[in-house]
């Protein structure tokens, strides 16, 4: 979960997908270094053939591209960089850590966070990523039994951000 704090209290909670095994999201204390509403990855994306069909869905920019094909950078809208190439942005949440190190969140929450923070806003990243692709039910249950900010707010229970955050 990502929490937006105001005066030390959580005012918004968003489900996230963080860095997968081998591309863990770096933990620590950071600050927002840059904000970009429409950002594209310079390192990751997909490769399409001459007809536009995806032939490599999780491609690195330095992978060979077939004749007539091209590399299409991954969109990272509402990007808030906080450490090197890592940041928070709108993206797909499969229910487990799946990114290359960034913190993905649903677009409505990314917009709310983006509109609420400025360059220099503190960011704290903590927690662990499971060694496997999916979190086990046991580790999810253990996390839910030990909430750090009171009862967790699941994506189905959390109301969408108010219109003034957009």
Residue positions per predicted region:
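Glycine-rich catalytic cores of cysteine/serine-nucleophile enzymes that process amide/ester linkages
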Residues: 1-34
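Short loop segments at secondary-structure junctions
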Residues: 8, 35-36, 85, 108
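Exported/periplasmic cell-wall-interacting domains
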Residues: 23-27, 46-166
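Short acidic, Gly/Pro-enriched loop/turn segments at secondary-structure junctions
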Residues: 39-46
């Amino acid at each position: 979960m990502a929490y937006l704090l105001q005066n030390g209290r959580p005012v918004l909670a968003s489900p996230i997908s963080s860095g997968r095994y081998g591309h863990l999201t770096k933990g620590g204390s950071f600050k927002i270094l840059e904000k970009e509403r429409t950002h594209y990855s310079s390192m990751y994306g997909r490769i399409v053939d001459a007809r536009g069909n995806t032939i490599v869905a999780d491609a690195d920019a330095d992978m060979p591209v077939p004749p007539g094909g091209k590399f299409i950078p991954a969109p990272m809208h509402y990007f808030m960089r906080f450490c090197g190439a890592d940041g928070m942005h709108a993206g797909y949440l499969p229910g487990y850590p799946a990114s290359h190190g960034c913190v993905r969140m649903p677009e409505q929450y990314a917009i709310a966070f983006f509109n609420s923070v400025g360059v220099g806003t503190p960011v704290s990243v903590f927690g662990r990523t499971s060694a496997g692709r999916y979190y086990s039910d046991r580790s999810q249950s253990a996390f839910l039994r030990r909430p750090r900010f009171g009862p967790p707010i699941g994506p189905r229970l959390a109301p969408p951000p108010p219109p003034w955050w957009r």
